[in-house]
Amino acid sequence: MTTSVTSGAPSTPTPAVNSRGRVIVASLIGTSIEFYDFYAYATAASLVFPALFFPNQDGTTALLASFAAFGVAFVARPLGSVLFGHFGDRVGRKTTLVASLLTMGIATVVIGVIPAATNPGWAVLAPLVLVLCRFCQGLGLGGEWGGAALLATENAPEGKRAIWGTFPQLGAPIGFILANLVFIGLSQNLTDAQFTSWGWRVPFLASSVLVIVGLWVRLKLIETPAFTKVVEAEAVAKVPVAEVFRTSWRKIVSGTFIMLATYGLFYLMTTFTLNYGVAATSPTDGSPAGLGYEKIDFLWMLIVGCIFFGLFTLASGPLAEKYGRRSMLLVVTGGIAVFGLLFVPLFAGGTIGVQSLLILGFTLMGLTFGPMAALLPELFPANVRYTGASVAYNLASILGAAVAPFVAVWLWEAAESPVLVGVYLTVMAAITFVALWLQKETRDVDFSGDIRA
C-alpha cells in the first residue's frame, strides 16, 4: 500500500501574462486612434483647412501651408520617440503607452475646437495653435507605435512575433476606415457650408471616445516579460537614447531606410490620392488639375482600398514567419518600385483604373507595413528596444512622410500630372531595397534573451 504525501511547500506561482485578447485590443486601439487622427487631419487638410486657416493665400499656397502644418507632427515624432522611449526603456512599456495615448488624445480634441482664422483676433493665432497641437500630436505619436509594437511582440510566443506584430499594424486600416466613414456621414448629412463651418470638427472631438476606451484597456495591462527580465537583470539603461546610439547606431540607420518606402507609399496613397482625386479638372484658383471626383465617391474608393490594406496586413505575418522578414520585404519593395511607374496609366484608366491603383497600392502597403512591428524591434536588445525601434520608425516618418505630401503637390504642379510623383515613390523604394539587401535576417534573433546593449 502506498501513501501519497503532499508537500507543504508552496508551489511556484505561474507568472502573470497578458492574454492574447488583451494584447490585441491594447496594441490595436492606440494605433487605430493614431491613424484615425492622422486621416482626420489629412482629410481636413486637403478639403477645408486651406480655406479655414490660410484664407489669404492662393489655392496652391494655402494647400502647401496646410500640408506644412501637417508635417510639423512628423518633425516632433523623433523627439517623442526619444522622450517616450526613455521612459519606456526605464519605467516600463505599460506606463509609457498610457502617457503617449493621453498626449496625442488631448491634442487631437483641442484641434476640434480651434476657431477659424477668419474669426476676429484669430488670423495669426489660429494657425499657430493648429501647429502647436500638431506638434503635441507628434510627440505622443512618437512614443505610441514603438510601445504598441513591443506590447505585441514581447508578449508573443516564440515563432509568432511577426503574426502578433500585425495586431498594432491593423490600427492603420481600421483608423482610416473609421475616419472616412465619419467624413462620409457628415458630408452626406451636412451642406458644404455646414461641414466647413463646424462639421469638420466632429471627427476630432469624437476621437475622445476612442482615447477613453484605450486608457481603460491599457491600465489593465501587466508589464511585458522582456522588460521584466531587464529589470531583474539590473540592465536598465541610464540614458537609453545615448546607449542605443552608442551601441546600435547602424541599426537605427538601417531601420530608418527600411521604413522609407513604407512611409512614402502610405502617405501618397492616403493623402496625395485624395487631393488629386477630388481636385477640379479645370481649376480656376491656380491649383493643379486633378481627376474631378466627388469627395464622397473618392472616399468610398479609398475605403475599398483600405479593406485590402487590412487583409494583406494580416496575411503578411504568416508570410514573414515562413520566408523571413528580409526576403519577403525585398520582393514587396520591388513591387512598390514597379507600382510607382504605373501611376500615370492607372490614373488615366477611368474609375476602374483609379480603383485598381488604390487596391494595388493598399495591398502593397499591407504587405510592407505588417512585418515592420516585428522587424524593427528585432534589431535592438530589450533594454533599449523601445527607444531604438521608435527612433528608427519616426526618423523614417520625416524622410518618407513629412515631406511626401508637400513634395507630391510640388511635383504634381511641375509636371501637371502624377508622373513625377510615381517616380518619387520608385526612388524611395530603390533606397529601401538597398537597405534591406544590406540587412541580415532578424527572424531567428534571440529576442527574449537579448537583454543588454
What are these regions (language model features)?
Residues 42-43, 249-309, 400-404:
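Extracytoplasmic gate region of multi-pass secondary transporters
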Residues 45-77:
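Extracellular/periplasmic helix-loop-helix junction of adjacent transmembrane segments
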Residues 81-93, 312-325:
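Helix-to-loop junctions at the C-terminal end of transmembrane segments
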Residues 102-122, 334-349:
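C-terminal ends and interior cores of transmembrane alpha-helices
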Residues 163-187, 393-404:
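Glycine-rich segments within core transmembrane alpha-helices of 12-TM secondary carriers
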Residues 214-221, 427-453:
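Multi-pass alpha-helical transporter architecture, strongest
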Residues 326-371:
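C-terminal transmembrane helical hairpin of 12-TM major facilitator-type secondary transporters
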Residues 383-414:
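A late C-terminal transmembrane helix in Major Facilitator Superfamily
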